[in-house]
Design a protein with these regions (language model features):
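Bacterial N-terminal signal peptides
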Residues: 8-17
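Short, low-complexity disordered leader/linker segments with a strong preference
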Residues: 1-2, 20-23
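Bacterial N-terminal signal peptides that target proteins for export
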Residues: 1-9
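A generic "folded-domain core" signal
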Residues: 22-176
Length: 176
């Protein structure tokens, strides 16, 4: 079958808006910057995901790892809210999943996190969110790359409450 230039142009003209909409849906949409925190929404697999994140203000114990690559993230997904994670910027050691290898302190509150690859996840997400709302900073301590030494990352919590409220408004809890 041979395509005429007119037919080819018509097909492109008809499909271009569909491609543009699909490309726009794949891009994150910023809900706002709230002091040290940013709130964003993203369509993923036909579902809306909202997350708030802050980058580490200080990182110690891992040479050549910029603090800006280390993030504390709270995510709302249709299948789970208040998912709290730290992206370390390196893979945790393989045996780091026994117990709570990463400890996060917020004021007087201690929170245990388990690890998988380059992330650490809160064991008690609700307690973590409550601590973040009431704290000034969160400090995570855990094993360094290849289990050598200890890494420490400090995240500012200024603006967390507003960023959390923004993602909660944009991705409200499902009614049961």
């Amino acid at each position: 079958m041979s395509w005429s230039p007119v037919l080819a142009a018509l097909v492109v003209a008809l499909l271009l808006p569909v491609v543009e909409v699909a490309a726009q849906q794949a891009q994150p949409r910023k809900l706002g910057d709230f002091q040290s925190w940013t709130a964003v929404t993203l369509g993923e697999g036909g579902q809306k995901i909202c997350y708030a994140f802050a980058r580490a203000a200080r990182s110690e114990g891992v040479p050549n790892r910029p603090a800006q690559g280390v993030m504390l993230v709270v995510t709302h997904r249709p299948q789970g809210r208040d998912q709290v994670a730290i992206r370390a910027g390196y893979n945790y050691p393989r045996n780091a999943d026994g117990g709570d290898p990463v400890q996060v302190s917020v004021g007087g509150t201690a929170l245990g996190f388990y690890t998988a690859q380059d992330s650490a996840f809160a064991r008690d997400n609700r307690a973590a969110v409550a601590a973040f709302r009431n704290g000034r900073e969160a400090t995570a301590r855990g094993p360094g790359p290849n289990g050598r030494g200890q890494a420490s990352d400090t995240f500012p919590l200024a603006g967390f409450g507003q960023a959390y409220d923004a993602i909660s408004r944009d991705c409200p809890a499902a009614r049961r």
